[in-house]
Amino acid sequence: MTKFPEGRQASAVIPLLWRAQEQEGWLTRPAIEAVADLLGMAYIRVLEVATFYFMFQLQPVGQIAHFQICGTTTCMICGAEDLVSVCKEKISSKPHVISEDGKFSWEEVECLGACANAPMVQIGKDYYEYLTAEKFADLIDQLAAGEVPTPGSQTGRYAAEPATGLTSLQDHEAGKAAFNASVQLAVDLGDTVKRIDGSEVPLLTPWLGKGAKSKAAPKAKVKAAAKTKTAKAKAAK
């Protein structure tokens, strides 16, 4: 919040929601309300943000991973439907339904901006690119076994460079990292799947009291809460 000018703290709503979601894998009603209170925003305003972006989940997801499969043009042409079929076979026949063992869930989303390495799947903050049905099925099996597959291209391709390597602009080749920037950071931190199930370094989560149970918040109730809060504020004046 200190990154934003005085009076503009509400600009931190997206990163705060993202950090809140990392605690339980999805945004519970108490989490949304805690972010709203922290920023001095009406509950409904924070809920509006949470419902606008598909990176935010408003219902429970798999304990290990929630797969977001890009379903727009480039990925579909390159085989995204095969990835969806893998999810239906190994996780559940419908999106947003948690697997029987509680480990996984999935959904199809709009373009994730990795068209050069299509098809791809996002898990939390990480991209797994250049997938085939076989590679994706193996990736799920690795996660189920407690392993953490390296994000990025699953064929060894560096970022979006030619699969056979550069034929020009080779001056920067010497000494470059093994992976492109975002993948290298995730690998260096060892921070990939951990940030989905909330097992990374604990943050302050005032809405997670001892023995507290997470409950989904019907939109109507959140709206009512916002109205009640506004009415109380007016009465106080």
PLM segments and residue spans:
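Signature of N-terminal electron-transfer/Fe-S-associated modules in redox systems
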Residues: M1-K237
